Amino acid sequence: MAENLACGETSESWIIDNDDDDINYGGGFTNEIDYNHQLFAKDDNFGGNGSIPMMGSSSSSLSEDRIKEMLVREIEFCPGTDYVKRLLSGDLDLSVRNQALDWILKVCAHYHFGHLCICLSMNYLDRFLTSYELPKDKDWAAQLLAVSCLSLASKMEETDVPHIVDLQVEDPKFVFEAKTIKRMELLVVTTLNWRLQALTPFSFIDYFVDKISGHVSENLIYRSSRFILNTTKAIEFLDFRPSEIAAAAAVSVSISGETECIDEEKALSSLIYVKQERVKRCLNLMRSLTGEENVRGTSLSQEQARVAVRAVPASPVGVLEATCLSYRSEERTVESCTNSSQSSPDNNNNNNNSNKRRRKQ
């Protein structure tokens, strides 16, 4: 049963004040933020037009100098170096991240949001939790953060974005008013220093696939995307840079090959701008999580095969989220990742619960 939290009920909290005059209730902070795939305000300029290459652009459009610049800048969009250690030690509540990711995946599948929207949402959430501690006595704070991160990511990446309140589907425990979400959005963007068009593994995947395989195809990108999306679940991947995850994903699909297999050592040797040993460690972690056969592309589980069949019709982007969702926590994981695996979502009672929401007075 979801609780609808009105703005006034949280007036004593860190996120709300009583002056709502400065809130834009329409499309966000439109005077300060351009949601058309441009960098946010402040001083976060990147290159000539301020944009950062995202997945889908031709790898030939990225010069070697541009790639080098991206490799230097990517660390600015990573969580703190002690973030994973704090999650594993209990200093930060791992369940906050797990629950947020579970809900974000379900909402992205519901609205057919793209793979990059998932990646950006979690990038914002992880970077925020690095710098800002949520109040432990507010059960709703984690859900509000998840809604705000997804809202910001969808405005950055999607062309058809539902109203901010309508994002709260898939039976969330709490439901928030628009002005409450917008205040949290403002806290997120200021905490992240307005740097929201982040460099992610998807920013590099075309380049590395082309570098290793000599060409970029939809099939190679699709298969690489599966591995990248799956890395969002295991927090150990947060110790790797986005470029290293992208390189490992590119190697994993190239060594199975579309027409001929590329030797793993040969594939790794073609990676001149990243540390090959770290890429190999990342690749081995992918194998541990999903199984040697899946990383080598030689077989798929029954569930993965079922999802792959659904890739043929209308929405290939939506299938990527479904593929990510197909990796359940019961699949083989490395021992150290046990606590970061997700329970599979249970949607059986969604329709029954959707009409049970009440407003908390």
From Swiss-Prot:
Residues 335-361 are annotated as: Disordered. It comes from the Eukaryota. Gene3D superfamilies: Cyclin-like. Expressed in roots and leaves. Keywords: Cell cycle, Cell division, Cyclin. Induction: By sucrose and glucose. GO terms for biological process: cell division. Residues 339-354 have a biased composition (Low complexity). PANTHER family: CYCLINS. Belongs to the cyclin family. Cyclin D subfamily. Acts on the G1 phase of the cell cycle to control cell division rate in both shoot and root meristems. The complex formed with CDKA-1 phosphorylates plant retinoblastoma protein. This is Cyclin-D2-1. It comes from Arabidopsis thaliana (Mouse-ear cress).
